[in-house]
């Protein structure tokens, strides 16, 4: 479960400065109701508090803080949008693996090329904290995440997107990526 709040501190090109990016801060509350069950072994996944002993994961909830800079470059042969930011988090795999005791400062960003006014191609990168230590073939050190996506804006309300996401090393380390498609309708 996620609850997000974002505030734009500075608009792009503010103060008539064409080089100035937009700056946005965010607070992101996260809750993973399955962590306590996994850690206790009640679902048969990992027993005996292994998440706590492997990575110091004690919590099923946490709060992330973000700062992002975004800049559109419309005068290139095709318009390009660049987003670069930092995330302060206690989350392991964005909270999917629970929450550790200490914050880590992680980099993330994406680049979108607008092939047409309605079609965009994007790549994204998310650095991941290295909370888990490698234990033979059972647990591997976490790897960074990346995605490749294509999105088509059908109209001002509907967007269709498809892509591939690679999630580094996860505990099962056999299914580290996934193809996906989304339909987004905004009122």
PLM feature segments, named:
Residues 34-38, 91-95, 130-135, 169-174:
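Outer-membrane beta-barrel proteins
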Residues 1-7, 63-67, 105-109, 119, ...:
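Hydrophobic, lipid-facing positions within transmembrane beta-strands of outer-membrane proteins
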Residues 1-103:
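Outer-membrane pore/translocation modules
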């Amino acid at each position: 479960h996620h609850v997000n709040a974002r505030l734009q501190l500075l608009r792009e090109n503010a103060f008539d400065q064409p080089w100035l990016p937009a700056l946005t801060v965010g607070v992101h509350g996260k809750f993973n109701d399955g962590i306590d069950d996994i850690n206790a072994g009640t679902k048969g996944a990992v027993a005996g508090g292994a998440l706590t002993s492997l990575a110091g994961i004690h919590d099923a909830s946490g709060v992330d803080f973000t700062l992002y800079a975004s800049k559109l470059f419309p005068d290139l042969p095709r318009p390009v949008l660049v987003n670069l930011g930092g995330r302060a988090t206690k989350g392991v795999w964005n909270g999917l693996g629970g929450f550790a005791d200490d914050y880590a400062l992680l980099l993330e960003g994406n680049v979108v090329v607008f092939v047409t006014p309605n079609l965009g191609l994007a790549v994204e990168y998310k650095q991941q904290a290295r909370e888990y230590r490698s234990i033979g073939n059972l647990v591997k050190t976490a790897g960074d995440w990346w995605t490749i996506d294509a999105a088509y804006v059908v109209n001002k309300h509907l967007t269709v997107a498809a892509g591939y996401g690679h999630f580094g090393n996860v505990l099962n380390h056999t299914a580290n990526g996934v193809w996906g498609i989304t339909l987004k309708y905004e009122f």
